[in-house]
């Protein structure tokens, strides 16, 4: 089951998923995703393009979950960069290193996901210091505090306004990007992800042995 692993107790990738399945902290655990902060990191030697980056595979055919129509509606006339395997729209990065460079060279990362527990590209972009503009669906409000480490809304006009603001205000984009990186380092790093899983597995084994 997506977002749910049964190993003696219920484990979820976010509080959003846990609540959606009708569970609580009393009978479940949350193990949040993590990314490698030593790999996904800013490069101060790379200038950032003043454009809105999005990274999505098969985007037009996944409008229901990835918000392709919302993206079209909100970026009209704005400078954009799109990567991902979407024939007729965009090509994927040639390698993981290339994808990292794409994040590192982008001022703004724009995420329009409508139904996604944890968009991994969002975490990667945050780790690379991009200023985030995103919808406020599923787990995203657990990751992004609006105005502190990104800008989130489900209102198309407000999302477009956020993009326009960051295109004009490089200092604000830098501040939000730095705070986004800090969030990943402190809460969504790979080491913490592995440690949390190990602790959960050890706890489950010990509870089983004591029964």
What are these regions (language model features)?
Residues 107, 129:
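A short alpha->beta transition loop at the rim of the catalytic pocket in nucleotide-sugar-dependent
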Residues 146-157, 165-170:
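Conserved acidic donor-binding segment of nucleotide-sugar-dependent glycosyltransferases
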